[in-house]
Amino acid sequence: MRPAYERLATLDDLLRRAAELSAKTLIFDVEPLVAHWESGQAALDQGVTSVLDRARAIPGVAVVCFSTNSARRPTVPLVGDGVRAEYVALAGKPLRTGYYQGFPRPGAVIGDQLATDGALARRLGYAFLQYHPDPSSLPLGPRMMDWAGQVARPLLFARPH
């Protein structure tokens, strides 16, 4: 059976759905949900802190992991307060999965790209909650990747809800 797939437009909706799925592990793609691609260090630090605070409030969540294929790293400490908090830079999504293998199940990957985040979710057997903001707000590269991912979506996931 294929993992769950849903396309949602806001962080509130993504977190609500993760709670409904009783996910114990949440893996967040960093750009653009946590911090926009062109944002600076302060935006990354603030985004990681804010998303971690909100995600750890979901009952049953044991791990919150931020994962990006870029080299960006937060300068603030990840304070999980009872939740394991991790940050993986240069993650090599979707090819490298070893880092996530010990995380508790069920889990959800939350990100914007089917080709990287969605494929990672599929490889891990996790749900994929696709962050889908207004396409006009996306730079050309991510917009084109989104289009290509939608073409490949039927190969990775069942129909979206």
Regions found by a protein language model. Name each.
Residues M1-K24, V34, E38-F66, R73-A108, ...:
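Asp-based, Mg2+/Mn2+-dependent phosphohydrolase catalytic module
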Residues D29:
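Active-site residues of response regulator receiver
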